[in-house]
């Protein structure tokens, strides 16, 4: 169950700094060159729940897992991302303790557009009925090596699914 009182950013309508957006775009372009989705998380001050001002890239382990065991991991990093969930959970706890919570989990899509796929939804829910973390989710579209779109998604309790949420980009402060 989403706890919007303690984690209001999970409702979306966030404000990303221009520097954060540019870094996410750069990570997406670089990952495109490696033929894999970028992934990581975005953080911000707990005292300003809507503000997102930090980027923490993570390694997409999908290609490595596919090479090790293609039967268990049939998809490659081009259409899927896999992060170290234990490291991610540690970062969530650390962010809460230090007043710089994880607010957004981000990843890119290669040559297919910015949408929240059924796979994205299943990964976000981690096999449960709803996501275990109160986060928003940013998907960046990269086509031909160029970022052409991005969309923010949040969990909607009443719909029992993910819906698009608006977000703003802060030019300067």
What feature does the model see in each segment?
Residues 103-109:
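Active-site neighborhood of phospho(di)ester-bond hydrolases with catalytic His/Asp-centered motifs
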């Amino acid at each position: 169950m989403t706890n919007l009182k303690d984690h209001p950013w999970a409702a979306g309508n966030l404000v990303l700094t221009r520097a954060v957006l540019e870094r996410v775009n750069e990570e997406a372009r670089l990952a495109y060159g490696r033929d894999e989705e970028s992934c990581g998380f975005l953080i911000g001050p707990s005292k300003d729940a809507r503000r997102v001002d930090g980027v923490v890239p993570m390694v997409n382990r999908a290609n490595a897992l596919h090479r090790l065991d293609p039967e268990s991991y049939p998809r490659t990093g081009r259409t899927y991302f896999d992060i170290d969930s234990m490291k991610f959970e540690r970062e969530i706890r650390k962010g809460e303790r230090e007043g710089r919570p994880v607010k957004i989990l981000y990843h890119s899509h290669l040559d297919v557009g910015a949408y929240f796929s059924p796979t994205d939804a299943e990964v976000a829910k981690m096999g449960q009925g709803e996501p275990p973390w109160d986060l928003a989710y940013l998907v960046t579209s990269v086509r031909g090596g160029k970022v052409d779109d991005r969309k923010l998604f949040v969990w909607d309790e009443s719909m029992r699914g993910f819906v698009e949420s608006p977000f703003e980009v802060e030019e300067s402060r």
